[in-house]
A protein has these predicted regions:
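Bacterial Sec-dependent N-terminal signal peptides
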Residues: 1-25, 29, 34, 230-236
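Short glycine/proline- and aromatic-enriched beta-strand/turn motifs that initiate or cap beta-hairpins
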Residues: 20-71
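Hydrophobic core residues within well-ordered beta-strands of beta-rich domains
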Residues: 29, 65, 79, 121, ...
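Residues on the lipid-exposed face of transmembrane beta-strands in outer-membrane beta-barrel proteins
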Residues: 33-37, 65-73, 85-87, 123-131, ...
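Extracellular/periplasm-exposed beta-strand and loop segments of Gram-negative cell-envelope proteins
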Residues: 41-62, 89-119, 146-185, 189, ...
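Short N-terminal amphipathic alpha-helices
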Residues: 79-85
Length: 236
């Protein structure tokens, strides 16, 4: 029984290795559809609840859907190059906070689910180094083109606090608007991927180079983000 199990494991390992060699041969093109998630944020991006008190709230990573495909050419045993096209929703979010409406009357605004959504078409050009047959390190250049307006939204609730510290919740409304953000975003993606039986797990960090907006007296924010995708290779 043990002998049969060992033989079966060796056969499976051999089949996996053969499939990897056949499905990603040198000198061939392949198409890799992908789907996954992007975790994005803007650097130097804050809101000030109270300028006098210096109450600063920095933005955080926000998750967004992404999907697309790469076309890869395996140039040598160790080098490949790919060009991709993806849809990705990027942006940022803030933790919930309160702003003062009237300190004398102890009236406040409670802000919840404050976030920005920016849709892009991303075009990454990647140079891939095959560290092993399955493990790949990569670096490249990527251009992102904004689709439509950059939007933000949050829920705003009127609050009133009594002298005992109790909070009374009043009207709630949804606030929406558009952001000033450049249409083109250039970044440098670096990452790794692992492939087994044509299934590819891919992780990248995109270093933002473009200043997203120019505000006098403030450091201009840049859009950097992580992407995590799963794909499948089809050799042409």
């Amino acid at each position: 029984m043990k002998k049969n199990i060992v033989i079966l494991m060796l056969l499976l390992a051999s089949v996996g290795a053969m499939a990897q060699e056949v499905e990603n041969p040198v000198g061939k093109f392949s198409v890799i559809p992908r789907v996954g998630v992007a975790l994005s944020n803007w650097s130097n991006n804050s809101i000030y609840v109270s300028v006098a008190l210096g109450d600063e709230i920095k933005s955080k990573n926000q998750a967004g859907f992404m999907a697309g495909a790469d076309v890869e050419y395996r140039a040598t045993e160790y080098v490949g190059v790919s060009l991709g096209a993806y849809y990705a929703r990027l942006g940022y979010r803030f933790a919930d906070y309160e702003t003062v409406e009237s300190a004398d009357k102890k009236q406040y605004w409670g802000i919840k689910n404050h976030h920005a959504d920016i849709d892009y078409i991303q075009l990454p050009l990647m140079l891939k180094c095959y560290v092993t047959r399955q493990l790949v390190a990569m670096v490249g250049i990527q251009a992102g083109f904004r689709c439509g307006d950059a939007k933000f939204s949050y829920e705003e609730t009127s609050l009133e606090k009594d002298k005992n510290g109790s909070t009374y919740y009043k009207d709630t409304k949804e606030v929406e608007g558009t952001l000033i953000a450049k249409r083109t975003n250039i970044s440098i993606p670096v990452g790794v991927s692992y492939e087994y039986m044509n299934v590819i797990l891919d992780a990248r960090y995109n270093i933002g180079l473009t200043k997203m907006e120019n505000i006098s007296g403030f450091d201009s924010p840049k859009n950097s983000f992580f992407t995590f995708t799963v794909g499948y290779r089809f050799t042409l």
